A protein has these predicted regions:
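Short hydrophobic beta-strand element within catalytic cores of glycosyltransferases
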Residues: 318-322
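Nucleotide-activated donor-binding/catalytic signature segment of Leloir-type glycosyltransferases, i.e.
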Residues: 264-283
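Short His-centered aromatic/hydrophobic patch
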Residues: 89-95, 115
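N-terminal strand-loop element at the rim of the active site
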Residues: 11-20, 26-28, 32-70, 182
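Conserved acidic donor-binding segment of nucleotide-sugar-dependent glycosyltransferases
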Residues: 333-346, 353-360
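A short, active-site helix/loop in glycosyltransferases that binds the activated sugar's phosphate group
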Residues: 152-197
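Aromatic "clamp/platform" in nucleotide-sugar-dependent glycosyltransferases that forms part
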Residues: 301
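A conserved mid-protein helix/loop that constitutes part of the nucleotide-sugar donor-binding site
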Residues: 21-28, 220, 229-244, 261-264
Length: 390
């Protein structure tokens, strides 16, 4: 057990236990570290609407512009007054990495930058990031122009990514990524001079694995859980697949659990495709849906290490995922665990689902979840936090 040390955990949005994604992962990490004797405080750019009684919460005074002098002064004073030993920046994939750096902040605290996404963030599938402009001729010409300019834009985006990663590694004390694969990606895009600063730690399991799971509780449900956005999640692909499957599998349904800026577009696509037995459930606790679903679907352009895959396995759902991010094979190593489909091959994705829907349901192998257990994640984090920035 480490002697009491103080940790500030930052994310742009307030860290809570009821949100998904990075917010939930950060909250679970905070609880883990408290159990190891650390004291935790939260800091966010945007003000919190509801206080939690578990951790002290602070928000930056200037929510409109992170890089204001007021925010820097506030952060430095907070670190000094609270005797902060470590700053954990959970938003290091964003531009906050330039703020929480020794180039910007005057602090003795050890800065640990945490990248909760893939390193490439879809740049290796650049054309898939370009949304179509529409079906009219002017819109099609606009889309064509975007495609023509894509190689140059990709080159510039990768150049910017390299510069950002180099800055991150230079001015952070330590950098945590989700997978050993992402350490390799970092070193491919940057020099190896700061390789010693890189650590691979996946997120904790968000649910306890049920000891027993009756197949009788499972229904003929395909499930999507997550944010409804275009560039990364591409749920429109799943709707295209469902369009082909629904006439064949009339006793199956598709549930979409989540919300986001692309929801309205998806609902319009659903109407255009005349989709049946599709339910947009909005933002809800996904646990009841995992319990009754047989298959969880991901058709993303890029992911980090999506918690939805581990959550699905914990509740006996078979994950069917595009092999579009470099940690995919680590999460789904074999067909006993789930199904990996070649990236963006909708025909193969449809065929894979069709086969599973025709087969008798069998609970997938969840042995892979052992690597996300608390004792393993704890050991990895204690190694990162052991010696500060020594």
């Amino acid at each position: 057990m480490i002697a009491m040390k103080n940790i500030l955990i930052y994310f742009d949005y307030p860290i809570t236990s009821i949100q998904g994604g990075t917010e939930q992962a950060s909250f679970l990490l905070a609880r883990l570290l408290v159990r190891q004797g650390f004291r935790i405080i939260f800091l966010s750019l945007h003000p919190f609407k509801e206080k939690n009684n578990e951790f002290p919460q602070y928000s930056l005074p200037d929510s409109e512009y992170l890089f204001s002098r007021r925010n820097a002064d506030f952060t430095e004073k907070l670190c000094d007054e609270q005797n902060i030993n470590f700053i954990l920046n959970e938003g290091a994939a964003s531009d906050s990495s330039f703020f929480f750096s020794h180039a910007h902040l005057n602090t003795k605290a050890t800065i640990v930058s945490i990248i909760n996404f893939s390193i490439w963030e879809g740049l290796d599938h650049f054309l898939s990031l370009i949304p179509p402009s529409g079906n009219t001729w002017p819109a099609k010409l606009k889309t064509a122009a975007r495609v023509v300019s894509a190689p140059w834009k990709k080159y510039m985006a990768i150049r910017k990514k390299k510069a950002k990663l180099n800055h991150l590694l230079e001015y952070s004390d330590k950098v945590v990524v989700l997978s050993q694969k992402y350490i390799q990606d970092c070193l491919f895009l940057t020099s190896t001079r700061n390789a010693h600063k890189l650590y691979a730690i996946p997120n904790l399991l968000t649910f306890q694995i049920p000891e027993s799971l009756s197949p009788g509780t499972k229904q003929n449900i395909l499930l999507y859980v997550g944010r409804l956005s275009y560039a990364d999640k591409r749920v429109d692909r799943l709707l295209s697949v469902w369009k082909k499957l629904q006439p064949v599998h009339t006793d199956w349904s598709l549930y979409i659990v989540g919300d986001g800026e692309y929801r309205e577009n998806l609902e319009k696509i659903s109407e255009e495709y005349h989709l049946k037995r599709i339910f947009f459930m909005g933002h809800q606790n996904p646990e009841p849906f995992y319990k009754k679903s047989k298959i969880v679907c991901l058709t993303s352009t890029h992911e980090g290490m999506p918690m939805v895959v581990n959550e699905a396995l914990a509740y006996g759902c078979i994950p069917v995922v595009f092999d579009s991010f470099h940690a995919a094979k680590e999460m789904i190593p074999d067909t006993e665990t789930g199904r990996l489909v070649p990236a963006f091959n909708l025909k193969q994705y449809t065929k894979t689902l069709d086969g599973l829907m025709k087969e008798r349901y069998r609970r997938p192998n969840f042995k892979v979840l052992d690597k996300y257990k608390e004792e393993i994640i704890t050991r990895k984090w204690l190694h990162v936090l052991k010696n500060g920035n020594e």
